[in-house]
Amino acid sequence: EIVIETETEAVDESTETADTKSAETATIGGSYVDFDNMQFAINGKTYTLGQTTLQELIDDGVTFNEDDIANASNNLNKNSQSSGFRITLGDYWSGQVYVFNDSDAGKTASECYISEVYLPMHIGETQNVMSCAFPVDMTLYELLANERDPTDNRTYEGESHTTDTVEYKKDSTKYYGQYGYKFEFLDGNLQYITIDYLP
């Protein structure tokens, strides 16, 4: 069996506080946590984890970091996940997508499907590039009111801030590991979103 464990590096490490929250809203309807349709949108077009390839995003004109997208033609070993491909959201602000090769042979990264989306929020700022199937300006309380049974819910209370991590996960049927949704909050405001897929 193969263990797939990828630790995503935060692109945005900002911990600045604000009473305001992002005014963004979802462009895709439905449940906040939907394992049958793990979707995200870029520039208003909807894509699905486990189905959409990196090449489709390239063909649609998604603006990637030049250094990252130069690796799209590189070979990705079987049963492997790529490094992140950064998508510019604003000044010093990037989302990331990752691809996964679940075949028995090497493939180029561009041929592989999107397996993970990472979206950091800048509290008090908005962007119109990436969105999800839920309001990305929701609070911790709004998430828990809509999705009542998280797999894991952790709270850390520091001297000046409180962070909460809420996860909704399922076991992979092919690999040893879990996949799903992770929401990270700072003082109740959504700060990081990670959606990852495993077959």
What are these regions (language model features)?
Residues 40-46, 128-132, 168-171, 180:
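Short, recurring structural edge motifs at helix starts
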Residues 1-51, 55-61:
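N-terminal, intrinsically disordered, polar/charged segments of Gram-positive cell-envelope systems
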Residues 34, 45-51, 130-137, 145-147:
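Periplasmic/extracytosolic POTRA-like scaffold domains at the N-termini of outer-membrane
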Residues 102, 107-129, 193-194:
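A motif-centric signal for short, conserved binding hotspots located
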Residues 2-4, 95-99, 114, 120:
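Generic preference for hydrophobic/aromatic residues in regular secondary structure cores
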